[in-house]
C-alpha cells in the first residue's frame, strides 16, 4: 500500500468540505440582503417615538404636530370643554368604543377614557377623519364644540367622538404618555 492511497480519502473529504463551506458562505451572502431589507429604515425608526413640549399650551388652545406622517391634535381643554364632554351619555354616541391605544381595546367612549390625564384636561388624538382621511378643523368647530370635517360634514365633540355625519368611528387616540409635567411622548 502506497502513501498516496492513504491520503486519497482525506483529499477528497477536504474538497467536499471546502465546497460545502463555500456554498454556505455564498448562500448566506445572497440571503442576508433579502432578510435585511425587511427591517425598518433609519428614518422610520427615528420617527417611532417623539417628544412634544406642551409647556406653552394654554387652556383652550390646540397644538398640531406631525407624527408618522399624520397630524396629531393635542388640545388642552378648558373646564367648559371637560364639562361638555362628561355630560354626554353613551347612548348619544355613534361609536361607543373609546379607540384609545393606551387602555383596553373594548373600553367605552366616556370622556375619561378619551383623555390623557385623570383631570381630563389633555386630549391627544390622530387628526385624521375616520370617514375618508381628511383633516378636521379644530378650534371648537362643528355643532358639538369639537372638530368639523369640511370634506363630508362629520362633527366631533370636545372629546373627539363622532356625533354627526358619515364618519363611522371616533378619532383614534395614539400611544401617548406624560414624561414629565410639560412633555408628552408619542409612540
Swiss-Prot record:
<comment type="subunit">
    <text>The main subunits of complex b-c1 are: cytochrome b, cytochrome c1 and the Rieske protein.</text>
</comment>
<protein>
    <recommendedName>
        <fullName>Ubiquinol-cytochrome c reductase iron-sulfur subunit</fullName>
        <ecNumber>7.1.1.8</ecNumber>
    </recommendedName>
</protein>
<dbReference type="GO" id="GO:0008121">
    <property type="term" value="F:ubiquinol-cytochrome-c reductase activity"/>
</dbReference>
<dbReference type="InterPro" id="IPR006311">
    <property type="entry name" value="TAT_signal"/>
</dbReference>
<feature type="disulfide bond">
    <location>
        <begin position="134"/>
        <end position="151"/>
    </location>
</feature>
<dbReference type="InterPro" id="IPR005805">
    <property type="entry name" value="Rieske_Fe-S_prot_C"/>
</dbReference>
<keyword id="KW-0472">Membrane</keyword>
<keyword id="KW-0411">Iron-sulfur</keyword>
<keyword id="KW-0479">Metal-binding</keyword>
<keyword id="KW-0001">2Fe-2S</keyword>
<feature type="binding site">
    <location>
        <position position="152"/>
    </location>
    <ligand>
        <name>[2Fe-2S] cluster</name>
    </ligand>
</feature>
<dbReference type="GO" id="GO:0005886">
    <property type="term" value="C:plasma membrane"/>
</dbReference>
<dbReference type="InterPro" id="IPR017941">
    <property type="entry name" value="Rieske_2Fe-2S"/>
</dbReference>
<feature type="binding site">
    <location>
        <position position="149"/>
    </location>
    <ligand>
        <name>[2Fe-2S] cluster</name>
    </ligand>
</feature>
<keyword id="KW-0408">Iron</keyword>
<feature type="binding site">
    <location>
        <position position="131"/>
    </location>
    <ligand>
        <name>[2Fe-2S] cluster</name>
    </ligand>
</feature>
<feature type="transmembrane region" description="Helical">
    <location>
        <begin position="15"/>
        <end position="35"/>
    </location>
</feature>
<keyword id="KW-0812">Transmembrane</keyword>
<keyword id="KW-0813">Transport</keyword>
<keyword id="KW-1015">Disulfide bond</keyword>
<comment type="function">
    <text>Component of the ubiquinol-cytochrome c reductase complex (complex III or cytochrome b-c1 complex), which is a respiratory chain that generates an electrochemical potential coupled to ATP synthesis.</text>
</comment>
<dbReference type="InterPro" id="IPR019470">
    <property type="entry name" value="Ubiq_cytC_Rdtase_Fe-S_su_TAT"/>
</dbReference>
<keyword id="KW-1278">Translocase</keyword>
<dbReference type="InterPro" id="IPR014349">
    <property type="entry name" value="Rieske_Fe-S_prot"/>
</dbReference>
<keyword id="KW-1003">Cell membrane</keyword>
<dbReference type="InterPro" id="IPR019546">
    <property type="entry name" value="TAT_signal_bac_arc"/>
</dbReference>
<comment type="similarity">
    <text>Belongs to the Rieske iron-sulfur protein family.</text>
</comment>
<dbReference type="GO" id="GO:0051537">
    <property type="term" value="F:2 iron, 2 sulfur cluster binding"/>
</dbReference>
<feature type="binding site">
    <location>
        <position position="129"/>
    </location>
    <ligand>
        <name>[2Fe-2S] cluster</name>
    </ligand>
</feature>
<dbReference type="Pfam" id="PF10399">
    <property type="entry name" value="UCR_Fe-S_N"/>
</dbReference>
<dbReference type="InterPro" id="IPR006317">
    <property type="entry name" value="Ubiquinol_cyt_c_Rdtase_Fe-S-su"/>
</dbReference>
<feature type="domain" description="Rieske">
    <location>
        <begin position="89"/>
        <end position="185"/>
    </location>
</feature>
<dbReference type="Pfam" id="PF00355">
    <property type="entry name" value="Rieske"/>
</dbReference>
<dbReference type="InterPro" id="IPR036922">
    <property type="entry name" value="Rieske_2Fe-2S_sf"/>
</dbReference>
<keyword id="KW-0249">Electron transport</keyword>
<dbReference type="GO" id="GO:0046872">
    <property type="term" value="F:metal ion binding"/>
</dbReference>
<keyword id="KW-1133">Transmembrane helix</keyword>
Amino acid at each position: 500500500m502506497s502513501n498516496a492511497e492513504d491520503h486519497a480519502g482525506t483529499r477528497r473529504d477536504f474538497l467536499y468540505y471546502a465546497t460545502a463551506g463555500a456554498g454556505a458562505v455564498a448562500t448566506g451572502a445572497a440571503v442576508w440582503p433579502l432578510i435585511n431589507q425587511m427591517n425598518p429604515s433609519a428614518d422610520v425608526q427615528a420617527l417611532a417615538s417623539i417628544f412634544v413640549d406642551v409647556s406653552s399650551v394654554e387652556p383652550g388652545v390646540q397644538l398640531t404636530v406631525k407624527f408618522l406622517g399624520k397630524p396629531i391634535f393635542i388640545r388642552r381643554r378648558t373646564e367648559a370643554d371637560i364639562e361638555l364632554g362628561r355630560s354626554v351619555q353613551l347612548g348619544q354616541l355613534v361609536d361607543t368604543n373609546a379607540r384609545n391605544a393606551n387602555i383596553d381595546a373594548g373600553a367605552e367612549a366616556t370622556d375619561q377614557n378619551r383623555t390623557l390625564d385623570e383631570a381630563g384636561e389633555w386630549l391627544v388624538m390622530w387628526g385624521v377623519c375616520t370617514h375618508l382621511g381628511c383633516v378636521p378643523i379644530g378650534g371648537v368647530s362643528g355643532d358639538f364644540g369639537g372638530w368639523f370635517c369640511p370634506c363630508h360634514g362629520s362633527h366631533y365633540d370636545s372629546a373627539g367622538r363622532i356625533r354627526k355625519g358619515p364618519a363611522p368611528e371616533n378619532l383614534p387616540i395614539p400611544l401617548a404618555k406624560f414624561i414629565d409635567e410639560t412633555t408628552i411622548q408619542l409612540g
